[in-house]
Amino acid sequence: MIKQRTLKNTIRATGVGLHSGEKVYLTLKPAPVDTGIVFRRADLDPVVEIPARAANVGETTMSTTLVNGDVKVDTVEHLLSAMAGLGIDNAYVELSASEVPIMDGSAGPFVFLIQSAGLEEQDAAKKFIRILREVTVEEGDKRATFLPFEGFKVSFEIDFDHPVLRNRTQSASVDFSSTSFVKEVSRARTFGFMRDIEYLRKHNLALGGSVENAIVVDEDGVLNEDGLRYEDEFVKHKILDAIGDLYLLGNSLIGEFKGFKSGHALNNQLLRKLIAETDAWEVVTFEDASTAPISYMRPVAAV
């Protein structure tokens, strides 16, 4: 049986919020079967919990924000991408502020944290959501689609009219039956343009942003001394974001996601449309792991 997974141990990290610029303490904790990923604002009394579900997404400007009443948790997508990539079904994410720390701008540090905590299999079947038919949302020239696929595949195309990006790969397709999330996707960093940063800071966004936690691009090139981690790092980061956003379904996917210029808002619209169209998906479990189409879920042996 493919079993649900949680963390073996509690693990902590400290970082800075990308948009708030605040110092944040992050604690990842094991959680019981069928808990899902639950964010907890430990700085509040009483502590406020926000399950990582599509229905709890309140804002999608520059990042994905979960809300419960007037309490929010910003920038959840990179951590959720790491949870998805390592197949973590159940965990508590405790925060000392309203934003998940940005770390280095990728999911890499979160992958390292989760692997350091260790993975533990639980005595219950892991639930997958299998896409049964096409579901699409569009907004102007932007598009996001789910398609049936025996495995998990994410295809993405960006279209930036910018001298640096025009000459780089702007599309990628990753089939996780043959590609490692950890090696090929998790280290792709978020990116921003110098021309936008002044505007963002005026609106109290990207206050914690720097070349330490983002790829910064001006008209002439990439400002980061070490350059890019992947030739197609820009579009790979959009794939990373999408994987995190899709994990708000609450389960791992069996299907294909295709995005064209899609972002957090359209990704969330797609999830809500899928959930509403109950004939477009089904929940499945696997008694025999060898019959499952998803192998990328087992990158590390769970003890």
Swiss-Prot record:
Cellular component terms, GO, for this chain's entry? membrane
Necessary cofactors = Zn(2+)
Q: Could you tell me the superkingdom of the organism this chain comes from?
A: Bacteria
Q: Does the keyword Lipid biosynthesis apply?
A: yes
One GO MF term, please?
A: UDP-3-O-acyl-N-acetylglucosamine deacetylase activity
Which Gene3D superfamilies does the annotation name?
A: lpxc deacetylase, domain 1, lpxc deacetylase, domain 2
Name of the top EC class for this enzyme:
hydrolase
The record's catalysed reaction(s) read: a UDP-3-O-[(3R)-3-hydroxyacyl]-N-acetyl-alpha-D-glucosamine + H2O = a UDP-3-O-[(3R)-3-hydroxyacyl]-alpha-D-glucosamine + acetate
Q: Which family does it belong to?
A: Belongs to the LpxC family.
**PANTHER family attached here?**
UDP-3-O-ACYL-N-ACETYLGLUCOSAMINE DEACETYLASE 1, MITOCHONDRIAL-RELATED
Q: What is this protein called?
A: UDP-3-O-acyl-N-acetylglucosamine deacetylase
**Organism, scientific name:** Pseudomonas putida (strain ATCC 47054 / DSM 6125 / CFBP 8728 / NCIMB 11950 / KT2440)
Could you read off the lineage of the organism from its UniProt record? Answer: Bacteria, Pseudomonadati, Pseudomonadota, Gammaproteobacteria, Pseudomonadales
